[in-house]
Amino acid sequence: TGLKPFACKECGKSFSNKAYFESHKLMHAGIKPFECTECGKQFLLKQLLKSHQLIHTEETPFVCPECGQGYKSKQGLQNHLLCHTGETNFTCKECGKKFLLQKHLNRHKLTHSSEKPFICSECGKRFSRKDGLGMHQLIHTGEKPYVCTECGTSFRVRPQLRIHLRTHTRETPFKCEDCGRVFATGTKLQVHKVTHTGEKPFTCEKCGKSFTQKTNLNTHQLTHTGGKNFKCEECGKCFSRKDYLRVHQRFHTGEKPYKCNECEESFCRKDLLQTHELSH
């Protein structure tokens, strides 16, 4: 019939179902009657509690038909499926970066805000988000709780481990619809898709040159400043970026972290490994 006889006096929202109406009133009262026995977190609705409780188990009942990745909620699976289609419907007006979901865009927009209320007690670095602070603090503790069962490599966050595992399985679930090329992560697919569109959303304010990726713009901007602030203590060579210095230092230490899965030969730089792998 479409009748909604139950109207909320607080906000005017109407309901056809009395049970939904009663649950809605609890929201205004701040009452969350359903509590998780594992962590104490409280929820307004019983189904929200049930969905939450999957976090405390290894159960992932919602499986992607494309790549087999499991998720604890139907919404999580639906969000993941967008990675396979390559849809990026939400664009940041500040920098042009695109996102699969509105919530990811909202989270990103905080990086453009000057407001950073979350402060690290160890080093004073500020963050716009609480989870960003939490992840940063692992640097000080050295904690890397997510361990690869194949090779023992540890990671600070679970998504890093999940991506790393694909180096062992050689899984490449993200396919470009334009050329058929496949990628291990959705991010790499999005970066690749720009090669088909020719889009270069990141523009240098100094000279107007445009780039497909923000990292390329950041590197380019150093050519205007001429700054080489990172100095090698071994040989005195200076670099414009800390990661360039870190790679250079491997020549002194002999560290070769990039290993070929085919022949076990190791390299100090990832691009050298990629060039080598073409020989197989």
Curated annotation (Swiss-Prot):
SMART domains: ZnF_C2H2 (SM00355). Keywords: DNA-binding, Metal-binding, Nucleus, Repeat, Transcription, Transcription regulation, Zinc, Zinc-finger. It comes from Xenopus laevis (African clawed frog). GO terms for molecular function: DNA-binding transcription factor activity, RNA polymerase II-specific; RNA polymerase II cis-regulatory region sequence-specific DNA binding; zinc ion binding. A zinc finger (C2H2-type) spans 6-28, 34-56, 62-84, 90-112, 118-140, 146-168, 174-196, 202-224, 230-252, 258-280. Signal peptide: none annotated. Belongs to the krueppel C2H2-type zinc-finger protein family. It is found in: Nucleus. May be involved in transcriptional regulation. The lineage of its organism: Eukaryota, Metazoa, Chordata, Craniata, Vertebrata. One of its GO terms (cellular component) is nucleus. This is Gastrula zinc finger protein XlCGF46.1. InterPro entries: Znf_C2H2_sf, Znf_C2H2_type. Its main location: nucleus.
